[in-house]
Design a protein with these regions (language model features):
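Kelch-like beta-propeller repeat domains
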Residues: 2-12, 22, 35-382
């Protein structure tokens, strides 16, 4: 795992997050530090690079389509399904990889969404059975993992919705009310630290499978499924809706990579860049001013990749192309791709959650067999 240096401030030890050294009048970031031991050998004492940390205790059972987020000192994974059932299970991990069973959701749920506002982790919507319709329920967990029933999604039951944080809000967007129906939703709902529910301006187009990420003071909701397979790209949409910390709605330039489709879009943030991709090595990149560029950041084209953020890194894990992959692509804050150890088990669509400098990829499935689900939890540290 990553090595750390601590400095004393006010009689307390604080972890040093970044180190710089002056070279030619410029500050250069230190990636690794070594110290000489008594035998004269150089020992690594500090690393600012993302590293594979092995596996954490496995999930209680193999599942896919969980939702993951964090609150306080815990990364949380909730719900999900296997080949025959959906689950209400909630499992939490701290930065030491200790697993804790939290209070269950108020009902089984798969294809739900998760987001945190700093005070609570929220799990919203989903479906109770493998082919059932959407739910309106929202469960909130505080930093002690105490569960509270938050206000229901106010406009419609929903599954396959997107979630992320902006400012003091956990925000949920889009989705679909019925499992096998073409109707899609444009509703956007925000929850604050008092569990107050606020309806924000709707998405520009109703869609499910929208991908939400947080970029500074913005929440970006990108891509998704229109429900109309005859509308081009099998119904996928390239829209990018943006909400600021006051929930003011604007739009950014559309996604540009026609090969990526935009269904099951992956998204993550590296430093001051939001990165989106799927079915391609090319990525659409939005900076802090919401200006879009494109670049080749992934090592291999694959579908079902999970994107997540830890420290200043964007991490894209797993997928299938055409066989299941263990590949983990890492992009740093300068958009440089870094190689790292892959997943311990090849799979697509693991669920990600980050606590502090620790990123966990949990569960996932093998789409080449009938719902072959995994309970593996891989750990990366920044």
């Amino acid at each position: 795992m990553a090595k750390a240096v601590y400095v004393g401030v006010g009689s307390k030890a604080h972890k040093m997050k970044k180190a710089y050294i002056g070279i030619g009048g410029k500050a250069r970031k230190v990636k690794k530090m070594y110290i000489g031991d008594s035998s004269g050998k150089a020992r690594l004492c500090y690393s600012a690079e993302l590293e594979y940390g092995g596996t954490a205790p496995a999930l209680s059972c193999g599942r896919v389509w969980m939702a993951g987020t964090s609150v306080g000192s815990y990364a949380m994974f909730a719900g999900g399904q296997n080949d025959s059932s959906c689950f209400d299970t909630v499992e939490a991990y701290n930065a030491s990889r200790t697993k804790i069973a939290a209070a269950a959701l108020r009902g089984p749920s798969a294809e739900l969404a998760a987001a945190s506002n700093g005070s609570y982790a929220f799990f919203a919507g989903g479906r109770e059975a493998p082919k059932s319709d959407g739910k309106m329920a929202v469960d909130a967990y505080n930093s002690s993992l105490t569960r509270t029933a938050a206000a229901r999604l106010p406009n419609a039951r929903s599954l396959r919705l997107g979630g992320t944080r902006v400012g003091s809000y956990a925000v949920f967007a889009g989705g679909q009310p019925l499992y096998g129906d073409s109707m899609r939703l444009a509703y956007v709902t925000a929850y604050d630290s008092a569990l107050t529910c606020t309806a924000a301006s709707e998405l520009t187009r109703g869609r499910s499978l929208v991908k939400g990420v947080t970029l500074g003071n913005y929440a970006l909701f990108a891509g998704g499924d229109s429900g109309n397979i005859f509308s081009g790209n099998d119904g996928s949409l390239s829209n990018v809706d943006v909400y600021d910390s006051s929930l003011t709605h604007t739009t950014a330039a559309d996604l540009s990579n026609s090969d990526s489709m935009y269904l099951y879009l992956s998204g993550a943030v590296a430093g001051s860049y939001a990165i989106f991709t799927n079915k391609s090595t090319s990525c659409d990149i939005y900076n802090a001013s919401l200006t879009k560029t494109t670049a080749t950041l992934l090592s291999m084209k694959r579908e079902g990749v999970t994107g997540a953020s830890v420290g200043e890194y964007a991490v894209f894990a797993g997928g299938i192309s055409p066989v299941l992959s263990t590949i983990v692509d890492v992009c740093d804050a300068s958009l440089t791709r870094i190689s790292t150890t892959g997943l311990s088990v090849a799979r697509r669509e693991p669920t990600a959650a980050t606590v502090g400098d620790t990123l966990l990829f949990a569960g996932g499935w093998d789409s080449t067999i009938h719902y072959g689900t995994y309970n593996t939890v891989d750990v990366y540290t920044a």
